[in-house]
C-alpha cells in the first residue's frame, strides 16, 4: 500500500547556481579590486591622522562581495579589523547611532567573519564592538546577518 500520489522521482532536482547565492554585481573582479585598493590606503591614513571613525566610514562606503573576489574580501577584512582596533570603546556608541541599518549589518557581518578566524584577528576587539552594536541597534542586526545570503 502506498501513500504517495506524486511520483517524486519524476521531478528533477532544483539546481542551485552561484547567481542564486550571490547577488549580481555590475562590476568585474578587477573593478572591485581597484575600488578596494583605493579605500584601504584612505582608511589607513585616517587611522594615522587619529580619525579612525572616518576610516571606518570610508570602508563602509564600499563593501566588496562575491565569490570571485575572496582575496579582495580578505584584504578588506584585514583593514576593517585594523580600523575597529583603533577606535576607542567610548566612541563606538555615538558612531553606531549615526550608521544606517545597512552599515550596521555590514559591521556585524564583518565582525562575524573576523570571529570565524580567531588566530588572525583580535577577538576581544570584535566582541567589544559586537556588544556595543547589539546594545544600540538591537538583535535585529544579528537576525538580518544570519538570515542574509553569504555575499560578504
From Swiss-Prot:
Q: Is the Electron transport keyword given for this protein?
A: no
Domain of life of the native organism: Eukaryota
> Keyword annotations for this protein?
Actin-binding, Cytoplasm, Cytoskeleton
| Subcellular location, record wording | Cytoplasm, Cytoskeleton, Actin patch
| Gene Ontology terms: biological process | actin cortical patch assembly; actin filament branching; Arp2/3 complex-mediated actin nucleation; endocytosis; regulation of actin filament polymerization
Q: Which GO terms describe its molecular function?
A: actin filament binding
One cellular component (GO) term of this entry: mating projection tip
State its role.
Functions as a component of the Arp2/3 complex which is involved in regulation of actin polymerization and together with an activating nucleation-promoting factor (NPF) mediates the formation of branched actin networks.
The family annotation for this protein states: Belongs to the ARPC5 family.
Subunit description:
Component of the Arp2/3 complex composed of arp2, act2, arc1/p41-ARC, arc2/p34-ARC, arc3/p21-ARC, arc4/p20-ARC and arc5/p16-ARC.
Task: Give the protein's recorded name.
Answer: Actin-related protein 2/3 complex subunit 5
What is the organism field in this record? Schizosaccharomyces pombe (strain 972 / ATCC 24843) (Fission yeast)
